[in-house]
Amino acid sequence: TPEVDTKKIVIRQTDVNRPALQFAGYFEYFDYSRIQLIGKVEYSYLKMHDDDYIREMTEKIFKAGIPCMIFCRGLEPRPLFMELGNKYGVSVLATDDGTSSFFSELNRFLKIELAPRISIHGVLVDEGVLITGESGIGKSEAALELVKRGHRLVSDDVVEIKKTNNDELIGTAPDITRYFIELRGIGIIDVKTLYGVQ
């Protein structure tokens, strides 16, 4: 659906839904905020029904305000889906990936991208060594000493931390400062060029 303005689509839910029950007419507890995936089961079920029935059920799903609908396994959406997608501003997409594998990958991707996050002042070195403290106390210098001893620099100055599940935090560097470290009296150095990437 190239006519749909994708900049207006907001995805807030990390879970994904396969709307087999909705195509069967059951809309209790339907979470419209989830991305909808169509696999062989849903596709073959729709083939059993006439266009009027498919239009009615699909319109109910699209009207609810779903972010998008993705057809898996190279299944081609009927023109009806494109028409209703344009009408309600819902992107209709397709992938050649198998439904289960795409479901898992999409779910993992959404959990990382939509994870709660904070930015803190400090230096992060591989496997959870977070050095924090007041400005000018030598955090970057301490991190550089660890890098010289084989550790990997993750981020200097600003560390973005995401909580991907109940017991896992992932720290990353903002794109603009990735691979760089600022040392007092020396300036900014490119750690990747000087020490390589492991």
Locations of the language-model features?
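Gly/Thr-rich phosphate-binding loop signature of adenosyl cofactor/nucleotide-binding cores
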Residues: T1-F62
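Catalytic-site beta-strand/loop segments enriched in glycine and acidic/polar residues
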Residues: Q36-L37, T58-R73, I118-I137
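Fold-independent oxyanion-binding glycine-rich loops
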Residues: G39-V41, R73-G74, D96, E127, ...
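Hydrophobic/aromatic ligand-binding patch that stacks against planar heteroaromatic rings
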Residues: K60, L84, E145-L146
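Residue-level detector of anion-binding/catalytic polar loops
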Residues: P67, S91, R152
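Extreme N-terminal, non-catalytic leader segments
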Residues: I70-R73, R78-E127
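Glycine-rich phosphate-binding P-loop
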Residues: E127-V154
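Conserved nucleotide-sensing/catalytic segment adjacent to the nucleotide-binding pocket
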Residues: R152-Q198
